[in-house]
Amino acid sequence: MSTNPKPAFRRILLKLSGEALMGDEGFGIDPKVLDRMAQEVKELVELGIQVGVVIGGGNLFRGEGLAKAGMNRVVGDHMGMLATVMNGLAMRDALHRAYVNARLMSAIPLKGVCDDYNWAEAISLLKSGRVVIFAAGTGNPFCTTDSAACLRGIEIEAEVVLKGTKVDGVYSDDPMKNPEAVKYDELTYTEVLDKELKVMDLAAFTMARDHDMPILVFNMNKPGALRRVVMGEEEGTMIKAK
């Protein structure tokens, strides 16, 4: 057996929830969590893996509550997209401080703040070893950041969408509420739909399924889990066609 194992993936799309950046704060960005995540991404870059990142915005803004209170959903979603840009700026800065070359691309033009999203340029940057952070979701309201992660993953021809969450995989029930919940190591797209498991919203999930994009759900708050995932070790839950 080789003493220097090769990564299981060459190019990945890492989806982080905005909540993952909060740490124990309850709101905003925990600098310690941000720096740890930047270090974990740096490890992947040093392994020669090409990394695209999509971050949610739920730590800074959640449109659902305001929509229920009467705010126009489109306005709420635009605010949510801007929250993902703020998280993207924080992540880019953390990567730069960790001496990792990173570019931030936004689906909404924000001249002087970050680059506009450009598919060909994103792939060129990934090939040159830069981390590319995709912000502002898909640029459209009514689309989640999970949809953005699957869309960007498909566009950049990533081999997998890694969904970093607060639990270490997909369970038969909510493990926070039900101690009897069983963790799955592998699932097919069909099994997820049949069992009505909550992996991501249906639009995002069916997009991944239709384009045969594997999804791997793991706990981003567990130190070393991201590296284990990309090295093909047993970590999290893999969802694919067969």
UniProtKB/Swiss-Prot annotation:
The keyword 4Fe-4S does not apply. The keyword rRNA processing does not apply. Its main location: cytoplasm. One of its GO terms (cellular component) is cytosol. Its EC number is 2.7.4.22. GO terms for molecular function: ATP binding; UMP kinase activity. Allosterically activated by GTP. Inhibited by UTP. It is found in: Cytoplasm. Homohexamer. Catalyzes the reversible phosphorylation of UMP to UDP. This is Uridylate kinase. It comes from Shewanella oneidensis (strain ATCC 700550 / JCM 31522 / CIP 106686 / LMG 19005 / NCIMB 14063 / MR-1). The lineage of its organism: Bacteria, Pseudomonadati, Pseudomonadota, Gammaproteobacteria, Alteromonadales.
